[in-house]
Structures are given as structure tokens and as C-alpha cells.
Regions:
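Rossmann-fold dehydrogenase core element
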Residues: 191-196, 207-249
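Structural detector of well-ordered beta-strand residues that form the stable sheet scaffold
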Residues: 66, 90, 194-196, 220, ...
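C-terminal hydrophobic helical "lid"/dimerization subdomain
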Residues: 145-147, 173, 183, 187, ...
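Mid-domain Rossmann-like dinucleotide-binding core that forms the NAD(H)/NADP(H) cofactor-binding site
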Residues: 25-26, 31-122
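Glycine-rich cofactor phosphate-binding loops and adjacent beta1-alpha1 units
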Residues: 56-61, 82-84, 100, 104-218
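Residues in the short beta-alpha loop(s) of Rossmann-like NAD(P)-binding domains
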Residues: 94-95, 201, 225
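Glycine-rich phosphate/adenylate-binding loop and adjacent beta-alpha elements
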Residues: 1-27
Length: 280
């Protein structure tokens, strides 16, 4: 209590506090020689994105995966798709250096939402279409009727863009509220496919009632990608040790504790992918 007002710690532990209480259930025992900087990414960020394709919504070998947002969370999902053996991994992000970086981690195609405009959903559907319109001839739909449209799209879509709370110093999002991106992620998911919403939007999202009811798509909640910390984090440590997960190159800048304010500013400016504050 502070002057009679209840005070709650951020995320239940108070990660931005000078003093915090680490409850036992928040502690995960790890036995590794990996650098602390890499292990910090397993508290959220990289681990949450990777879990998007391996915990709740599980990517499948040969599947079509789309990731909206190439920040640390989205790049975790890209790596999950690569490790799974996805057929193609399409990354959507307005920032060029992030699109280019995603190609190094497993993306096969990148799209600029500002350049694609309202045609981005159809562009993704075409990329996921297959060689023809006949399923028994290697295509992805039963014919040219309405089913042919809703059957085209990605098997798995991860929305990890989030809102743009401050004007960045790089290319801006087409919709700072992220509502449009959430709807695009839903629309480019094929009938029977899976969508995970990991980014935040503070506005109502008007999902079409017919597609919710009839197309058999599944929406997965994006709370840390379904990460089970006691089960998954030790597994991800092993994957980092084996070189399956890249937890090195995604750290694009390190800061001292005195540079914490600059770290937050750089994150808001989106001039870095992942920043790590190191204690001396």
C-alpha cells in the first residue's frame, strides 16, 4: 500500500524496480555456461516468439508460416519455423533492416506492409497458393468457388507487431493502433489454419462474424506464446547450446545500467532489435 492505495508490481514481480521480491515460482533452475546476456532473452522476447511455434500453436514441417513483426518476438517465431522445417516463412515488417535480418534467421520471403498496402493479404494468399487450384494435382483448394478463396492462405500466422506508441526513427507502421495488422493476420490465415495474436492493440477489433463461424480458423492467445517456463526454458537452453536457436545476433546493442534510459529510448525508436542492460 502507498498512502492507502494498492500498488502492484509490473508482471507480478516488478522488473523495473530497484528492489524486488523473486518468488520461488518465478525461478527456473538452469545448468549451463551460456552468457547471461543470452539467457535474458528466455524470460520473454525470444522465448515467447519461439514458443509461438512449439508450445501452444505448433508449426508443422512443410507448412506455410507468416510472421507479422520482425522484432525480438517475431524473430523468435521465425527461428521456430526454421527449426521445424516450415516450407516457407513469410515475414511482414515495415522496417527494412529488420526484414533483411529476418532472412538470416530463416525467413524465405519478406514483405513491406507500407509498399503492399491493402493488397498484402492477397499477396500472401498467392504466395501460399500452391502450383495450381486443384488439391489432387498438388494445389491447395477444391475448386474455383468460394472455397478456393478461403482455402488459400498460410497454415500458421503469428502477429507480433504490436502498437506503435511513439513515432520511430525508422519506417513507421501502416497502422499505429495495430488493429489493421491483427485483421490482416486473421484474413491471410487459410480455412482450418491457426492465428496467434501476440502484439497489443488497445482498440476493439471488428472480426467478421461469418469467417469466425464458418472457416474453422483457430485463434490462439499470445501470452508468451503459450510458454511453459519450467518445461520449455531448459529445452530452449539446450537448443541454444546446439546452435539451433540464435540468441547471439539478435542482441544488437548492450548497455550499462546508467544507460537504461537510452536503452528504452532506442527500443521506442526501433533502431535496435534487442537491447540488453548489463550489470557490472
Amino acid at each position: 500500500m502507498l498512502y492507502g492505495t494498492p500498488v502492484y508490481a509490473q508482471a507480478g514481480i516488478g522488473g523495473m524496480s530497484e528492489i524486488m521480491t523473486a518468488f520461488e515460482e518465478y525461478c527456473v533452475p538452469l545448468f549451463t555456461d551460456l552468457p547471461a546476456a543470452q539467457l535474458t532473452l528466455l524470460g520473454d522476447q525470444l522465448a515467447s516468439g519461439f514458443a509461438a511455434g512449439h508450445a501452444d500453436m505448433r508449426f508443422e514441417p512443410g507448412s506455410d508460416v507468416v510472421v507479422f513483426g520482425a522484432g525480438p518476438v517475431g524473430l523468435g517465431a521465425v527461428q521456430a519455423a526454421r527449426v521445424t522445417g516450415a516450407g516457407q516463412v513469410i515475414v511482414v515488417d515495415p522496417i527494412k533492416y529488420r526484414r533483411d535480418f529476418s532472412m538470416k534467421l530463416g525467413a524465405t520471403t519478406t514483405l513491406d506492409p507500407n509498399a503492399e498496402g491493402d493488397g498484402i493479404v492477397e499477396r500472401i494468399r498467392e504466395l501460399c497458393r500452391g502450383p495450381n487450384d486443384r488439391r489432387f494435382a498438388g494445389g491447395t483448394s477444391w475448386g474455383r468457388a468460394a472455397n478456393a478463396v478461403i482455402s488459400r492462405g498460410a497454415d500458421f500466422v503469428v502477429e507480433a507487431a504490436g502498437i506503435q506508441s511513439m513515432p520511430p526513427k525508422v519506417e513507421p507502421q501502416p497502422d499505429p493502433t495495430n488493429v489493421k495488422t491483427v485483421l490482416q493476420a486473421w484474413d491471410c490465415t487459410r480455412a482450418g489454419g491457426h492465428t496467434m495474436l501476440m502484439g497489443f492493440t488497445l482498440q476493439p477489433v471488428p472480426f467478421p462474424g461469418a469467417s469466425l463461424a464458418l472457416f474453422g480458423r483457430t485463434i490462439h492467445p499470445g501470452q508468451q506464446g503459450g510458454l511453459h517456463v519450467m518445461r520449455d526454458i531448459p529445452r530452449y537452453v539446450k537448443l541454444i547450446e546446439k546452435g539451433k536457436i540464435d540468441a547471439t545476433s539478435v542482441i544488437t546493442k548492450k548497455y550499462t545500467l546508467d544507460e537504461s534510459r537510452q536503452a528504452v529510448q532506442d527500443t521506442a525508436d526501433r533502431t535496435i532489435i534487442t537491447g540488453v542492460i548489463e550489470f557490472a
